[in-house]
Amino acid sequence: MPDLSFSVDGAEAVSFAAAPLVSFKLRIRNANVSEQIQSILLRCQIQMETTKRRYSPKEQAQLFELFGEPERWGHTLRSMLWTHTSATVSPFQGETTVDMPVPCSFDFNIAATKYFAGLDDGVVPLNLMFSGTIFFETDDAGLQVEQISWDKEAPFKLPVSTWRDMMDHYYPNSAWLCLRRDVFER
């Protein structure tokens, strides 16, 4: 019976894609190193752990629209859902590393974009939460199916520069503009 653990070894912008992507290098380990994993249909929810970093006065001002006055951040600053993504993992034994693509754009998630854009530097603490289906061989060469336990998570500190470099690559010298509906309809 598989007992998987997950960690993130790094992240980088994908240079040649139809849409902006950040690729996370995901390491998957099975505690039973001799067990043959045939495939994993992996789902991942990524949360931005906004309370786990410090903010400069300039960043606090830039994040006002998301979190309000810094004096109220004890009540308004919360973890935010960034996105959901999925990946299919090929057969392995013991351990494997896979690329997990995460689509990004200015208009995909306005709150996430405002958050990333409001940071000058440093890292964005993330929590990747996994679920999905594992297909594995049994000792008698049968195939078993099992769900990934809901408690499987991996923290990662995404450099703000990774997101910024990706946006600069796909949207050079551009920014997303969010308009009120009445202004847009003119």
Regions found by a protein language model. Name each.
Residues 169-186:
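Surface-exposed, Lys/Arg-rich phosphate-binding patches that contact polyanionic backbones
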Residues 15-28, 37-46, 104-106, 172:
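Contiguous beta-strand segments within globular domains
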Residues 62-118:
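Extended, solvent-exposed segments with strong compositional bias
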Residues 61-70, 135-172:
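Short beta-strand elements
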Residues 7-12, 27-28, 85-86, 110-113:
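Short structured motifs
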Residues 1-23:
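Low-complexity, acidic Ser/Thr/Pro/Gly-rich terminal tails and inter-domain linkers that flank the onset
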Residues 43-49, 99-144:
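Internal, hydrophobic beta-strand segments that form the core of beta-sheet-rich folds
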Residues 46-58:
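Short aromatic-acidic-glycine turn motif
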